[in-house]
Amino acid sequence: MSGWRDIGRRVVDFAVTFILYYIFGVALHEMGHALVGQALGWQASVTYPSPWAGWTSFPQWQQMPMLDMVLIALAGGLIVCAFFLILSAFTEDWESDMVLLFFAPLHGFYSLFEVAYILHAIPQWVLATIPILPAAIIWMWMLKTRG
């Protein structure tokens, strides 16, 4: 019976860890956009309508040079990707490592797709769905190489 208890505990640990890192990732992602925008001299505001979603607004978005737009778009996801990869190197529990290694590439790919979106190269539905596919492939590869 203790085997089932251990499995149940790990499932609950994984679910709680997933939710917490998801919320933290959303917050850090949007703050990354805002901080890079402010560093480039633009006014920014971050809105979190729920723990599951957020967006960063720039009142002067239409007046920005394309390079600034691209840097701001890249910043959110790449900051989370780098932070989660570094954090996973120091994580000893299985649940945190699994979640961090899933969200790191997801945010990395999402940042690339955000650039494509602001360049009008992809529609919003692609931005909202497709980055999970390459992220899942990389996640499985990282899990396999970690043993």
Predicted regions and their residues:
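Short pre-active-site segment immediately N-terminal to the catalytic Zn-binding motif
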Residues: 7-27
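Membrane-interfacial, low-structure loops and terminal tails that flank and connect transmembrane helices
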Residues: 1-6
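Hydrophobic transmembrane-helix microenvironments that flank and shape a buried ionizable site
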Residues: 10, 26-30, 73, 108-111
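Metalloprotease/metallohydrolase-associated module, dominated by Zn2+-dependent proteases
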Residues: 55-147
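Small-residue-rich helix-interface/hinge motifs
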Residues: 21-69
